[in-house]
Amino acid sequence: LMKIILNVVEDFRQDLKNQNKNIELLTNLDNKKEKNFFIVGIENRLEQVIANLLDNAISFSENNQKIEIDLTETSNNLVMTIKDQGPGFTESSPQKIFKRFYSNRPSSFGEHSGLGLNIAKNIVELHKGAIAASNRLNQRGAQIEVLLPKI
């Protein structure tokens, strides 16, 4: 899973550079290279999950903001966390964002179909995982956690 995350992040870094957007993608994975973060999954579908989550975080971010991507483990799961510094969620909306065509997007952040996070949720569930959204504690922004069963 780590390799997939790093590849998708690198693609997004290049896209941001090409678009002259100054949004920093931070991974806390360098000190974890020796870890074996293995899951059973369909690689291109997991890439799609990560890409959809990063695309969403980037679309809510402004220049000079950071998006953090981390990977940790529990006894049974790998936990991927993506945190942004955007506006976060209204109190009633964190889990609604995974519904088809739902948008929590203020008009200043542009139009989206409302399908990306629903697709991500469906793919995660196909892999016997779970996905959850929340506001960051004591900070501005949103946090998405993806749990996937490890081997």
Mark where each language-model region is.
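Short conserved segments within the C-terminal catalytic ATPase subdomain
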Residues: 15-30
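Short helix-loop "hinge" at the ATP-lid/N-box region of the Bergerat-fold HATPase_c
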Residues: 57-58
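Short conserved segment of the HATPase_c
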Residues: 89-101
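Short alpha-helical Gxxx[C/S/T] motif in the catalytic ATP-binding
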Residues: 116, 120
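Conserved glycine-rich
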Residues: 129-130
